[in-house]
């Protein structure tokens, strides 16, 4: 099993897809990485040679912030916004959508399950 940036890549998948299992590497970055290292995206992970793995590992760790480092940075950014009391920090603290989405309806992912409020008596 090939390990890159602390992630076990699925052996049967094409390299182009397998790289996206790394947090911080999407389709675009995977293609950029393959182009820069000169490795074909059609190669299966199980068919990679050790020098190719080393080259991929060096390129990803040298050029991108991925996995733990990226998660820590994102968490620190959110923590900073909460501490300085910005609007976005307030939305994070209250568990509401941060980027201006509507909340009268929808936003159930951020707000959690619906809490029923007693209706007005006639």
Curated annotation (Swiss-Prot):
Signal sequence, start to end: none
Region entry Disordered, spans: 91-122
NCBIfam families assigned: uS13_bact (TIGR03631)
Pfam entry (one): Ribosomal_S13
UniProt keyword list: Ribonucleoprotein, Ribosomal protein, RNA-binding, rRNA-binding, tRNA-binding
One GO cellular component term: small ribosomal subunit
A GO biological-process term: translation
Protein name as catalogued: Small ribosomal subunit protein uS13
Family that this chain belongs to: Belongs to the universal ribosomal protein uS13 family.
GO molecular function annotations of the record: rRNA binding; structural constituent of ribosome; tRNA binding
Keyword RNA-binding: yes
The protein's role, per its UniProt record: Located at the top of the head of the 30S subunit, it contacts several helices of the 16S rRNA. In the 70S ribosome it contacts the 23S rRNA (bridge B1a) and protein L5 of the 50S subunit (bridge B1b), connecting the 2 subunits; these bridges are implicated in subunit movement. Contacts the tRNAs in the A and P-sites.
PANTHER family according to UniProt: 30S RIBOSOMAL PROTEIN S13/40S RIBOSOMAL PROTEIN S18, SMALL RIBOSOMAL SUBUNIT PROTEIN US13M
Domain of life: Bacteria
Subunit structure: Part of the 30S ribosomal subunit. Forms a loose heterodimer with protein S19. Forms two bridges to the 50S subunit in the 70S ribosome.
Record bears the keyword rRNA-binding: yes
